Amino acid sequence: MQQTATPRTQAEEFLTREMATLVIYEQARQSFAHVSGWLHPAEGFLLMRLASATNAMPAGAVVEIGSFKGLSTCWLASGLRSVRSRTGADAGKVFAVDHFTGSPEHQAGGKFEDAEIVKHGSTLPLFRENIQKAGLTDLVEVVQAGSLEAVKTWSGAPIRLLFIDGDHSYEATRDDFAAWSKFVPVGGYTCFHDVNTWEGVTRFVKELMADPSRRFITVMGAASLLVARRIA
């Protein structure tokens, strides 16, 4: 005989789901603890869950602009891995677009001077090492080029999830969006990192959201990550 749901059983079921989600979050966070970067774990978890939500958006690729040492790449690729584990289907790959020579702030004397950039001039070897340690190599395809160069070789395939985290200037954010968002179909998502923490990114995103054409709307976010869904 089927039991009637009560407030108590509903609360217990809700908490059970919450705890299961927390376990997934914590396991992923610990898996990527070896990768340095400026992505808050809550932001990474949101990216991971978006990448795994294939039933909630159109078919297409996952593309990130700006990969640095691979932290966001790991979160995104882990979402694809969960799709493969859950369905057995080919989940595709994360296309990691980056020249790997760092943004202006990572150079010697920059606001966020990075030892790897200063010493080796590239984070690509460390990026590959980090992806390999996370067991995600088969789910990541490196596109070693600047964003505006890489888009020239893009196949034209739809992009269901686009993550923009490259050069944080207003002009670069605007240009990255203009170059890549045209491949995002209605129902697809574009994510911006460092909203409300970097002036250039913030200014562009505010302009985009105020655009009368309303091609994108804000649907969720975490820390400095803003998620916009294409509606037109």
Question: Which role fits each region the language model picked out?
Answer:
Residues 1-13:
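N-terminal auxiliary segments of SAM/dcSAM-dependent transferases
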Residues 40-41:
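Short helix-coil-helix linker/hinge
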Residues 12-36, 45-232:
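S-adenosylmethionine/decaboxylated-SAM
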